Design a protein with these regions (language model features):
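Acidic, glycine-rich A-domain
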Residues: 1-313
């Protein structure tokens, strides 16, 4: 991700500017599990280490205490909006160009805790609906890869005293099921190696069932050679056709609709640095801004289909 993080943020800031101009509320979060090693593990006496971020209950999904969601930019920032955007841009520039001395403690790139993020959205989405009084919400999940694995809570003997039982964690397997007592549903698929039966797909499906007025939009950054695997993994028919190849060669983007996502966009990471400025009048209406934004997209050799589709949702 660090090869394209700054280019990705440039695209993000363009989208935020559009939303800001037409008064579309938004929140921008970055997920991370980066933390210094001395924060992670307690000593034999139990001192130090990170506190659990959940009430531990056997057989519930386990979210590691290093997981964090960082709220970088908000539509409610007011006069701080531009400063927040500048901080985000400088951070991404430092990460992409290897200026580690300018990256704050705990803000380096890490794994991909997408599963934990989907779980956290169960609280963020209703809060957003309540705060902004909107009837529909687009939730965008942007990654450069699949989610890292997630565990469940179990009881196990203490490392220091085998006679003492304590909470631990163990990997999910194909016999695990996800039960949502609130809506009365049981999901049978928790296999990590196949999208149709993956825990990520299961969590997304559960999110969609809980919030039917929320579009779950995935954006996946693809490096050279990944597009065929992207199609095989996420297309329901598991078929990468000649038409798919031709479309990718022309637009360097793909639009799929796998179970769990309202829509999933694949974008060539090599094309993210394309940037063209567009201008509108200071007193332009929302319709004029929207028209100028979409007209600008037509001048781009790639990603225009993706961004145009997103604007129309």
């Amino acid at each position: 991700m660090h090869f394209v993080i700054n280019d990705t943020v440039k695209q993000l800031l363009n989208l935020l500017w559009f939303c800001k101009k037409v008064n579309i509320p938004f929140e921008v979060y970055g997920f991370t599990n980066d933390s210094p090693s001395e924060w992670r593990n307690p000593d034999p006496d139990g001192r130090g280490g990170l506190e659990e971020i959940q009430v531990m209950k056997e057989n519930e999904i386990y979210c590691h205490p290093t997981f964090r969601l960082l709220n970088f930019v908000s539509s409610d920032s007011g006069k701080d909006f531009e400063e927040q955007c500048q901080h985000l841009f400088k951070l991404s520039y430092s990460l992409q160009n290897g200026y580690s001395d300018y990256v704050p403690y705990g803000f380096n790139l890490s794994g991909t805790p997408l599963n934990e993020t989907i779980i956290a959205l169960r609280e963020l989405i209703p809060d957003f609906f309540k705060k902004h009084q909107v009837s529909k919400l687009n939730t965008v999940l942007l990654t450069d890869g699949e989610s890292q694995s997630i565990s469940r809570v179990n009881m196990c003997p203490s490392y220091y005293d085998p006679n003492v039982m304590q909470f631990g964690r163990i990997s999910l397997h194909s016999r695990c099921q996800l039960r949502d007592r609130k809506i009365g549903r049981v999901y049978h698929a928790c296999n990590e190696w196949n999208w149709k039966n993956s825990i990520t797909q299961t969590l997304l499906q559960n999110l969609e069932d809980n919030f039917p007025n929320c579009n779950i939009i995935g954006i996946r950054l693809l490096q050279s050679g990944e597009v065929s695997r992207f199609h095989y993994q996420y297309k329901e028919d598991e078929n990468y056709t000649d038409q798919d190849k031709k479309s990718w060669s022309k637009t360097k983007s793909a639009i799929l609709k796998p179970t769990g996502y309202s829509v999933l966009y694949g974008i060539a990471s090599s094309r993210l640095n394309e940037s063209e400025e567009f201008e509108v009048k200071e007193n332009a209406t929302k319709a004029q801004i929207r028209s100028a934004f979409k007209k600008n997209l037509k001048n781009k050799s790639s990603n225009k289909k993706v961004l145009s589709s997103f604007v129309d949702m």
